[in-house]
UniProtKB/Swiss-Prot annotation:
Primary residence: cytoplasm
One Pfam family here: Paf67
Family named by the database record: Belongs to the eIF-3 subunit L family.
Entry keywords, A to Z: Cytoplasm, Initiation factor, Protein biosynthesis
One biological process term in Gene Ontology: translational initiation
Chain ranges of the PCI domain: 257-452
Name recorded for this polypeptide: Eukaryotic translation initiation factor 3 subunit L
Species in which this protein is naturally found: Emericella nidulans (strain FGSC A4 / ATCC 38163 / CBS 112.46 / NRRL 194 / M139)
Presence of the UniProt keyword Cytoplasm in the record: yes
Function field: Component of the eukaryotic translation initiation factor 3 (eIF-3) complex, which is involved in protein synthesis of a specialized repertoire of mRNAs and, together with other initiation factors, stimulates binding of mRNA and methionyl-tRNAi to the 40S ribosome. The eIF-3 complex specifically targets and initiates translation of a subset of mRNAs involved in cell proliferation.
Single GO MF annotation: translation initiation factor activity
InterPro entries referenced in this protein's UniProt entry, alphabetically: eIF3l, PCI_dom
Oligomer status and interactors: Component of the eukaryotic translation initiation factor 3 (eIF-3) complex.
């Protein structure tokens, strides 16, 4: 797809007329609605219909092949053109493309690599703009602001979903109806069905990278999070889905749901790791595995809860001392919270091109989201200390507690009110991922009556039957 004077950067591409460029601008204004049917891809530098059909198998294989790590900027531009050419052919051909999918996981590989290249290009572009050290590359990027554009990538994913009518099929399955009745001409083909399905997972990932965590969770409304789901058949897709869902829950302060998501996939991985060794995605899964343990450590520090024995043992082994420091709270824990968050969070991207003329104005998206998260952590820094005092009393004077903590009474009152509000979390029960019921996240509750604090504590009994069953299974 040759946009914005790409001809100057790539002499072999055809020049575009002023009329086409004006039409492109109009397309991008409308793309936020994602209902234009990929019409802008008509301006893609692509093969003719006959030759493209003959070479489609090669294009499909190339689309699922990772780009070299040290690929040049021209190679990244060319890769974008190739993806646009491929998706244009699949979406805008006269009727469905009759093609046998190379493998059941091929569609995931295509969507995964497409989004990875988009993510890495955005981060690279932001890095060049902020450093201001390579004027030649900065000029190329400045002249091609729509290459790997956010709207283009989102438009591809939404178009694949709409073309395949995959959401309608999934909704029918949840109602116990025949999905084939809702598939339509395109959705009945495996090529479109699989691309559409994994585009939903792709949207979850992209919206999370852009920082819209609520919309990220909303995209999975029609997908059931269980082992029977289609994404569970592809280990990398299975892992990716739970990572981004769990992270989105964490960033929306639903720590209990985040822990549940992370724990589910980590237990699954611990039971299947011997089968994964030697696989193409083993290293990537191992890295994400460590990241999720770091995120669980953060969530448990912010939302103390009982973990699965397998997760608890692994967490103690990996982050024993660090977890203890996180749970102690206080200003000393802040650097550790930030370190773990930066090491485990997605590599966030900006939805718009950077300002190449004013490098100082460009903000690293990771820094931005880290600052937002750390503001939340600062609100809960003294919760462990406050809890340790409140657990000793049923009623306590505000002035007395302020004296123990060496803070002003009104500041303590503010902390208590914030903590009580934060302790009310939404917990998923059924339905969409955003749905749930509001519950108290702590086993310690309190109420303020002027300067008197009334404390109540509920202790959950140990489920000894479950403990015995798990350990008997290990012995026998």
């Amino acid at each position: 797809m040759s946009y914005d004077e790409r001809a100057n950067a790539h002499p072999n591409l055809n020049d575009e007329s002023d009329v086409e460029e004006e039409a492109l601008v109009n397309d991008y204004r409308e793309q936020v609605n994602f209902d234009d049917g990929m019409s802008e891809l008509d301006r893609t530098t692509s093969l003719g219909a006959a030759s493209q059909t003959q070479d489609l198998q090669a294009q499909l294989a190339a689309a699922a092949t990772p780009l070299e790590y040290q690929a040049t900027l021209e190679t990244k531009f060319a890769s974008y053109d190739n993806y646009c050419s491929l998706f244009h052919y699949i979406l805008n051909s006269d009727g469905p493309v009759e093609l046998e999918v190379p493998s059941y996981y091929w569609a995931w590989d295509v969507i995964d690599e497409f989004i990875y290249q988009f993510e890495s290009f955005c981060r690279y572009r932001n890095r060049v703009a902020r450093s201001g050290s390579n004027e030649e590359e900065a000029q190329l990027l400045r002249e091609n602001p729509n290459t790997w554009g956010c709207y283009s990538v989102l438009n591809v994913l939404y178009s694949l979903i709409q073309k395949s009518q995959i959401n309608e099929q999934l909704a029918a399955m949840k109602r116990g109806e025949d999905p084939a009745a809702f598939a339509g001409e395109y959705g009945s083909r495996p090529l479109y069905k699989m691309l559409g399905y994994f585009s939903i997972i792709g949207l979850l990932r992209v919206h999370c990278l852009l920082g819209d965590f609520t919309l990220a969770l909303k995209t999975l409304d029609d997908i059931e999070m269980n082992k029977k789901a289609m994404f569970a058949r592809v280990m990398a897709a299975h892992f990716t889905t739970y990572y981004y869902v769990g992270f989105s829950y964490m960033m929306t302060r639903r720590y209990g749901d985040a822990i549940r998501m992370f724990s589910h996939i980590l237990v699954y991985v611990s039971r299947t790791k011997n089968f994964q060794k030697g696989g193409n995605s083993y290293d990537a899964i191992a890295k994400k595995n460590d990241q999720m343990y770091a995120l669980i450590a953060i969530c448990v520090a912010l939302h103390p809860t009982r973990l699965d024995d397998t997760i608890h043992s692994a967490l103690r082994e990996k982050y024993g001392e660090q977890l203890h420091r996180l749970q102690q709270g206080g200003p000393e824990a802040l650097p550790l919270f930030e370190e773990l968050f930066r090491s485990a969070c997605p590599k966030f991207i900006s939805p718009t091109p950077p300002d190449f003329d004013n490098p100082a104005l460009n903000v690293d998206p990771v820094d931005h989201h880290t600052a937002i998260f750390m503001d939340e952590v600062k609100n809960t820094l003294y919760n462990p200390t406050i809890r340790s005092y409140l657990k000793l009393y049923t009623t306590m004077d505000l002035q007395k507690l302020a004296g123990f903590l060496d803070v002003e009474p009104e500041k303590l009152r503010s902390w208590l009110l914030v903590n009580k509000q934060r302790s009310r979390q939404v917990r998923w029960v059924e339905g969409g991922l955003l749905e749930g019921e509001t519950v108290s996240a702590n086993d310690l509750d309190y109420a303020l009556e002027k300067d008197l604090i009334h404390v109540s504590e509920t202790k959950a009994g140990r489920r000894l039957v479950d403990w015995y069953l798990r350990n008997l299974a290990r012995v026998y």
